[in-house]
Amino acid sequence: MPMIQTAPNVNLHVEDWGHGQTVVFLHGWPLSHQMFEYQINQLGNDFRCILIDRRGFGQSDKPWSGYDYDTLADDLEAVFEALNLEDITLVGFSMGGAEAIRYISRHGSRRIAKLVLLGAAAPKMLKTPDFEEGIDKEVFDEMIENAIQDRAAFMESFGKDFFGVNLLNTPLSSRLLDWFHGLAMKSSPRAFVNSILTFSQADLRADLAKIDVPTLIIHGTGDKTVPFELTAKAMHAGIVGSQLIAYEEAPHGFFYTEWPQLNRHLTEFITSSVAIEEKVLS
């Protein structure tokens, strides 16, 4: 479908597939809507699936600025307005999950029926005096330095951690890792680095209290990118009535490694009148 203008000189690439209940997918950093291939191949048969490339990523325009969560939330509202969307199940992965939280906090839930947070990088990542359990600033500084010096090499290492690849575990082929790498390299260098600043510095703890729709949180307990204890448990505690499903030992990239059960849980949640049962899956 055509690009949708969300701000002066900013147009976002949007795919609109299928029919039925509306499900909007927000991709993670530093990928694009194509990361949801293994979800859309199945869910697109039953639902209207809308996929958006965030500004700076995929096939969307790549402006110099606007990578903070407020601006990204405003981009979403512009897309929803252009398509006249209502009764949305909003699905956000990683940075996309944080973006979804800020969207509801900033624009309300009049368009949103349900929220799904997949490995969401929220509510807070950075260690600060009032958040001693957070990640040291030096970790994010090193990410930025490595990305600036050799983004391709950084992604090769990051991708292995992302999917839990090690000497004893190879949950995906080298070709699929190459595909993942290619999606990441379609982002602009500016968006790549500025987004690290955004997801590392953001504090969405107060936003959680504004989530007033049924919410399903799915997270891998083996996530080395967005640690389960730091994020999933905090979101579950902060979002009233939320449900948490923990994929035992699953990595951050469980949208691929656990895609059959993820698709089943998404379908159950989208079609049910209440959230599905909280559980831990191995």
Residue ranges and their predicted role:
Residues 241-282:
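Catalytic active-site module of serine/aspartate enzymes centered on a nucleophile-bearing elbow/loop
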Residues 29, 88, 92-94:
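Conserved alpha/beta-hydrolase "nucleophile elbow" surrounding the catalytic nucleophile
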